[in-house]
C-alpha cells in the first residue's frame, strides 16, 4: 500500500487494541518497566529470560519480518541482565542478548538491525562452552547507534557518542565523539558549542505529544472512509 487508507476511527480502534495487548501480554514479561511503554507491532517483540528492566517511555518499533529480541541467559548459575533507561528508542530488527549485564542509558537511540551482546558465547578452542568469554556492556546516556551496528562484550560507549552505520564496536568509545568502522575508530569529536537535545525533551509532555499525534492522524486520514478502506483491501488501485 502507498498510504494508510484506514478512516481515523479504525486507526483509533486499532491503536487501542495494540495498547491493550502491550499491557496484557508484553508488560508482564519485564521484571520492571516504567509508564509510557509504546510498541509498534506487538507481535514483533520477543522477551526471553529474567532480569529485563526498563524505565519510562521506552519505545519499541518492531516491524513485520523485523523482530526486536531482548534475551537473557542462565549460564550455569549466572543469569544475564538487561537494564534500559528512560526515553530509549529501539528500532526494528534489534537483538540485545545478555549473559552477564547490558546497560543502556536514558535517551539512547538504536537504529535498525543492531546486535548487542556481552558474551562470545563459545570459547575460542572449547566451542562447547562459554568459559570466561563474557564482560558487561554499557551504553551511556544519549548514545546513538546507526543501522546494523554490532557492539561486542566488555565495551563502554560514552555519553552522547554516535556510532556510524555498519560499525563493529570491539573496544571502548569515549564520550561526545563520532566513531565508525570495523573496528570502530573515533573520526571526530562533537562540537561542544552545539546544544544537544534529547528524547526526554520531546517526551517531557507525554500527554501533549499524544494529543498532537492524534490531531495529525485525524488530519492525514480526514478523507478516508470505511468504504474506500474496504475497497483498498479487496481491489487496490495504483492510488492505494
Describe the role of every protein-language-model region:
Residues 1-117, 140-141, 175, 184-188, ...:
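Domain-scale signature associated with acetyltransferase and cell-envelope carbohydrate enzymes
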Residues 77, 129-142:
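Glycine-rich NAD(P)-binding loop of Rossmann-like domains
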Residues 95-101, 148-161, 167-171:
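Beta-rich strand-turn-strand
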Residues 120-121, 127-129, 173, 189-190:
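Conserved catalytic-core motifs of eukaryotic protein kinase domains, centered on the activation segment
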Residues 123-130, 195-201:
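Short glycine/proline- and charge-enriched loop/turn segments
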Residues 136-137, 154-155, 176:
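A short, glycine- and basic residue-enriched loop/turn
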Residues 162, 178-180:
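Short-chain dehydrogenase/reductase
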Amino acid at each position: 500500500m502507498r498510504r494508510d487508507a484506514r478512516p481515523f476511527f479504525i486507526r483509533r480502534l486499532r491503536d487501542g487494541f495494540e495498547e491493550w495487548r502491550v499491557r496484557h501480554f508484553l508488560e508482564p514479561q519485564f521484571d520492571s518497566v516504567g509508564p509510557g511503554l509504546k510498541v509498534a507491532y506487538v507481535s514483533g517483540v520477543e522477551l526471553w529470560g529474567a532480569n529485563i528492566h526498563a524505565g519510562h517511555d521506552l519505545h519499541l518499533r518492531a516491524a513485520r519480518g523485523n523482530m526486536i529480541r531482548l534475551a537473557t541467559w542462565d549460564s550455569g548459575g549466572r543469569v544475564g541482565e538487561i537494564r534500559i533507561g528512560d526515553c530509549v528508542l529501539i528500532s526494528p530488527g534489534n537483538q540485545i542478548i545478555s549473559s552477564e549485564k547490558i546497560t543502556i542509558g536514558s535517551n539512547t537511540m538504536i537504529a535498525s538491525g543492531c546486535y548487542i551482546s556481552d558474551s562470545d558465547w563459545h570459547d575460542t578452542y572449547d566451542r562447547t562452552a562459554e568459559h570466561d568469554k563474557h564482560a558487561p556492556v554499557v551504553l551511556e546516556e544519549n548514545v546513538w547507534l546507526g543501522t546494523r551496528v554490532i557492539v561486542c562484550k566488555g565495551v563502554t560507549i560514552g555519553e552522547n557518542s554516535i556510532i556510524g552505520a555498519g560499525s563493529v564496536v570491539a573496544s571502548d568509545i569515549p564520550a561526545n565523539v563520532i566513531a565508525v568502522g570495523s573496528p570502530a575508530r573515533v573520526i571526530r569529536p562533537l562540537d561542544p558549542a552545539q546544544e544537544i537535545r534529547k528524547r526526554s525533551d520531546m517526551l517531557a509532555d507525554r500527554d501533549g505529544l499524544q494529543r498532537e499525534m492524534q490531531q495529525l492522524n485525524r488530519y492525514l486520514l480526514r478523507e478516508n472512509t470505511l468504504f474506500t478502506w474496504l475497497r483498498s483491501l479487496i481491489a487496490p488501485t495504483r492510488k492505494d
